[in-house]
Amino acid sequence: MTTSPFTRRAVLATSAVLASSAALAACGGDSGGADTAEKIENPDENINPEGLPIVEEPVTITLMSRRAATSAEDWNQVSAAKEAQARTNIEVDWGLVAEEAAEERRNLLLTSGDYPEAFYRTGVPGGDLAKYGEQGVFVALNDLIDQYMPNLTARLEESPALRTGLTFPDGNIYSLPGIYDPETLGLRYQTKLWARQDWLEAAGMSAPETLEEYRAYLEEAKNAEDGAIPLGGSGIGGIFSCLYGTFGIANQGTDAGAAVDLDPESQKVRYYPASDGYREMLEFLHGLYADGLIQQDIYSSDFAAFTAAGTEGLLGSCANQAPAGYFGEVGKSYVPLKPLVRSAGDEPAWHAVRSELSSIGNFVMTDNCEHPVELARWMDFWYGEEGAKLFFLGVEGESYEEVDGRAELLPEVAEAASIDEGLRQHALFLGGWYPGWATGDWFRGVETSEQSTEGAKVVEPYALKEVWPAFTFTAEESQQITTLGNDITKYAEEAVAAFVTGERSLDEWDDHLATFEQIGLQDYVAAYQTAHERRS
């Protein structure tokens, strides 16, 4: 870094003037908030405003971080973290907390007031972002992004919908995003519907394209092997997703934060599990279940049982990213299906589309932050190509190498028992819930495997072109939505399971809709309509 102290002071002072008003508004009335605002207004001369290292003399930042079981026990021993420290001069006290205890720990820290400089990968809910943002506990990041985060700014400029999804009704951004590259199809179209090619051939069938043809295939699959499961899963949600386009629901994608889309007639927000299309989907699925064509314990089965059945070659059809990623060699025999249509001649439609804004709430800066500018610059490092490669791949030469312009994992990593096992001591992304920029150039997972990508190419021509990111609300709105949403979701899950399994007849649909209204569905939808209008 060659910037002189004089140049560094001049640049930082100019940036501070532009940042001061929002920083003061963002921070609460306690001394911690005032100190953080002061540090944003008057950055330390130790900070380099651009380039690396971020600081001339090392600085330590303190976080609370959720640690998934799939990640390393000590992140400072991960190659990517060690290399990032060497390049940035930022040392990190990660404050690792096991994922099962992370939510409780975060809430206790916020209640006590004795919280760290930032919460990292803890999944702060939108309601808490609004609540603590409005209180000044969470720092508004708008001007820090504009002045000190050029990599993230570039991502936001490439896709304005990202900024829209991050911004709260008060105009502030309180968290940093997880971003999916829209050109990486396996990330945008994750769950696909699959059928066994060898079973299709044995039955003399081509890949089904209509609901009737799909049912006929499942009937053949039922007798393909002893113990065969025509259509299975670890839960039924993935199967639902693959049928949304067929039945004209979820027409704004699957990342809105709730089961809402636009009513095709009124063009207003609707709760689509209360729509006619959803009822028709349940009717189709109940018919499959009643005839033994859907795994009979699908509502109680877990992921381990699902993968075991797939590995044993018992599944005729499933909905996931890529069967080969879970079932081993037998998984390679599955082929992706085009979006099913109700009748021959109907136009296929694919609505299981993820937003580019894959998550919010996984990085928030608090008003106890002693190093706000340093922390903003450190986070921005991960949104550039240099940092993103470290985050997802590790250090070149240790875990991957460049081959014909593409990063390829080294054999000892690629041939490990799993991608998680191979990259655990090299990369930081394991366990998900990360603020960062995922693209097919450096993200290595089942979503970007060859089979997943081929499946995504099959559905992509029929996919929604624009989808909603999650909505943001005021603290007051969030409290209402959370209360109503918990009751609505709990009832909906129980009722849907009963309709599919036949414990409850779909003849009771009108009573079902009446129950939704009694719970408060009208107010729930109205809140989403307000949020939709606010950002339209």
Regions picked out by a protein language model, each given a short descriptive name:
Residues 2-7, 12-536:
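Extracytoplasmic/secretory soluble proteins
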